[in-house]
């Protein structure tokens, strides 16, 4: 890792021996272990360990779960909120497990579209609800810091499965709950 940073510092015209940079390779290596720890965790295990037989057959919504991830194209952060709604069939999941699922997938190199899809597909596979919807809203620093340099752009993605895809009333109820 040190060789990587020495080459990086040289390429940008920086002195690798400058006082403020001496410990940078070690600090960044520790940071990267944290930022990309999602590769070492199984999202399916996180969900499987936190569900129980349900007594609810109405919509459940976990709203505005904050996250940050790293864009795989530019290695810059994107951050925002994810909301998950589902209608149980037999299994109810602990709310912290939804947050854990989001954290595992977001702590990987990502694009927002795949992040949203992975959360919905894993939830659908493990919990087997009558329907699931995932809505992700994020600000991308790659869009703010370079290229088009749009500071306030928010990107929204959604993935719908089951009743949320088939029934417009179910989808509308979820959207209304997000607004309230």
UniProtKB/Swiss-Prot annotation:
Official protein name in the record: GTP cyclohydrolase 1
Superkingdom assignment: Bacteria
Entry keywords, A to Z: GTP-binding, Hydrolase, Metal-binding, Nucleotide-binding, One-carbon metabolism, Zinc
NCBIfam families (UniProt xref): folE (TIGR00063), PRK09347.1-2 (NF006825), PRK09347.1-3 (NF006826)
A GO CC term assigned to this protein in UniProt: cytoplasm
Residues annotated for Zn(2+) binding in this entry: 71, 74, 142
Enzyme class: hydrolase
Pfam families, per the entry: GTP_cyclohydroI
Reaction(s) catalysed by this chain's protein: GTP + H2O = 7,8-dihydroneopterin 3'-triphosphate + formate + H(+)
A GO BP entry: tetrahydrofolate biosynthetic process
Similarity comment: family membership: Belongs to the GTP cyclohydrolase I family.
Entry EC no(s): 3.5.4.16
Gene3D superfamilies hit by this protein: 1.10.286.10, 3.30.1130.10
The protein's assembly and partners: Homomer.
InterPro entries: GTP-CH-I_C/QueF, GTP-CH-I_N, GTP_CycHdrlase_I, GTP_CycHdrlase_I_CS, GTP_CycHdrlase_I_dom
GO MF, one annotated term: GTP binding
Protein's pathway: Cofactor biosynthesis; 7,8-dihydroneopterin triphosphate biosynthesis; 7,8-dihydroneopterin triphosphate from GTP: step 1/1
PROSITE patterns associated with the record: GTP_CYCLOHYDROL_1_1 (PS00859), GTP_CYCLOHYDROL_1_2 (PS00860)
Entry-linked PANTHER family: GTP CYCLOHYDROLASE 1, GTP CYCLOHYDROLASE I
